[in-house]
Amino acid sequence: MIKRNLLLILLTGLIGIAVLNASTPDEQINTISDINNGIEVGSLKQLNSISFDQIKTDYIILNLWASWCIPCQNEVEELLKISEESNITVIGILVDDSVSNGREFIKDNKIPYKNILKEEESDIVLSQFNWTGIPTTLILDSNLLILHTLNGEITANEIIELTK
């Protein structure tokens, strides 16, 4: 009898844990980290592919992506909304992918915002902060200081909320 009750308690506990940890495909899964807060990404000014003198927005989004990354593909529409409908500059950084794949992805998705495709340039930028995978999105202020680091797929509303 005691063994049966103990087994039922354990089984109930395992089911409870499984239910709490279950996620649906539509569920947003990302984390906001403060690990990089306050780090200046000054190396962006050294890049030939981006002219920072022309950026007049209060915030800059750096989005680390690859063409083969499903969450990166999913968030393209959200990044397009941010770049077109808000006063936020979006810059993509190609990671762990070829330049030709990156160019094809940009063309296929009609991405108008700037992207850093060359590995030499992206390595210079990526060495300045901590990141663990893609997609990773960083919110910078106009002085290129990191305010937020988001690991995982993002939404436009989430970014807008964090930049209020």
Predicted regions and their residues:
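Thiol/disulfide oxidoreductase modules built on the thioredoxin-like
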Residues: 108-111, 118-163
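N-terminal targeting signals for export/organelle localization
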Residues: 1-43, 164
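Conserved Rossmann-like nucleotide-binding pocket used by diverse enzymes
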Residues: 40, 65, 91
